[in-house]
Amino acid sequence: MELNFTKMEGLGNDFVMLDDRNGAIVQTVPYPVLAKKLCSRRFGVGGDGIIIIIDSETADVGFKIFNPDGSEPEMCGNGMRCFAKLVFEQGIVTKQRFTVETLAGTIIPEILLSDTRQVEAICVDMGEPILEPDRIPFKCNRQRAVNEQIQVKGETVSITAVSMGNPHAVIFVDDVKKIDLENLGRAIETHELFPAKTNVEFVTVLNDQELVMRVWERGAGETLACGTGASAVLVAASLNGLTRETALVHLAGGDLSIHWDQQSNHLFKTGPATHVFTGRIKI
């Protein structure tokens, strides 16, 4: 079987996009197996994940994502911007604001057009942050895991746990460049206090409107950007009294603008998505 695919990236977080609205792909090969093959940067297309366009009975379109190790996360913010741009430009949806079914619930992206009606950016309503430990999930006796101390490799690390439909452990440090991300990130990702594992963000606060972060993604390792992670970081920073409700988050792949609307309690993330190339691959 040969598959048509589109390679997309959002701030360097890259994905292999597939249209399986007719179900032909999943009938041929399981998505986790396909993810392992296509995400290989030596033997496949290469990517931080595969994203599948599927039909939905509850939203305008359905979204599924699989990590390079075959695991299925609930959602991906950068992937959602790529997804939204692709389905809009391909005419799968025609509205600039539409609904997407994900494992994290219904997500609402909005396409922002230039004067020439080109896709300039995508603003994604990420929904409400989840702060109750049992829903993140994170093993904790408090109502919120804010500045919670845990033991990691014999050291005490202060984390704030947030879910944006997927779990995040946010750690504030003096200089993110000096962090041994692979060792610490992997240890926290698989920490026993996170029964579903977790994404890990190390953050340096520049001022009350700017943050710098590095991310270790659950099932993918270090990536250049993470949209749900940037959203979780703003929530964690705000809960710790470090930032305002709107901030610019600097990631290795570029910048995201994050706004936490206090009236609706929703997070809004705005950033770019780029078409890299299209192709066909035999599986």
UniProtKB/Swiss-Prot annotation:
Gene Ontology MF term list: diaminopimelate epimerase activity
Source species of the chain: Desulforapulum autotrophicum (strain ATCC 43914 / DSM 3382 / VKM B-1955 / HRM2)
Protein name (database record): Diaminopimelate epimerase
Residues under site feature: Could be important to modulate the pK values of the two catalytic cysteine residues: 168, 217
GO biological process: lysine biosynthetic process via diaminopimelate
Keyword annotations of the record: Amino-acid biosynthesis, Cytoplasm, Isomerase, Lysine biosynthesis
Active site: 76 (proton donor), 226 (proton acceptor)
HAMAP family: DAP_epimerase
Main enzyme class: isomerase
Residue spans crossing the bilayer: none
GO cellular component, one term: cytosol
Superkingdom of this protein's organism: Bacteria
Assembly notes: Homodimer.
Pathway assignment: Amino-acid biosynthesis; L-lysine biosynthesis via DAP pathway; DL-2,6-diaminopimelate from LL-2,6-diaminopimelate: step 1/1
Catalytic activity: (2S,6S)-2,6-diaminopimelate = meso-2,6-diaminopimelate
